């Protein structure tokens, strides 16, 4: 009887780990350029099952309108259409950051996260990839703490020195909702992994290479080229011609998909937060990551064009 139980457990475990990773992407897509490339990479990743895409606010940007989540949803919907994934839910998140942990309201995004998380478990968790502010995922957990055990959160944010364990929280995503970030860091029950800006900045795409590849992808390619060409960086005077782009968000998505070329370690949280361990990526292989990124997209687009 004991042998049968062990065998059953091993079979269940094998099935779970051979399945695609169920993922919700939470992104501030309209904020920049790299989000678009990250979402395309996630949607074409054979190891992923994208459960839905939600949008997060980026109110600190000088380009921010009165409804940044709506801006991002429009772009997300366009990408889903271009990749023939119209059936994937696309939802809007909170328009403002959390002002107090005692007055949290839900949004379409946080409601969706709660609903989907309840379908998973600790042994078969739902992965939430946060590419912008942490408003939606924090709101979801605060409103229904029971989902914490059913999810893994991957966050793209803040700077971190792995040698000294020094944190610099003066980073765009973190500034857009510092209360939400603190809540995640302080939550001892939450499985949290961070792709720091320090590590992700090493993934850089060159325009000449990117455009030559995108020209093969018809409408999707032209859509991404237009975004690259039309966006003007507000945070730097360097590279005004947009010859290169740091692919912060792509680094996180591809790190999850390619664990053999992305390396993380356990670190104590910042000194002002509840003391616990979180995972932080310390190194990636940008060259291999870039090669695999384009290879899978090319494979998907070729298959799509022949359907």
Where are the language model's segments positioned?
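Bacterial Sec-dependent N-terminal signal peptides
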Residues: 1-20
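N-terminal acidic, glycine/proline-rich low-complexity segments
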Residues: 19-307
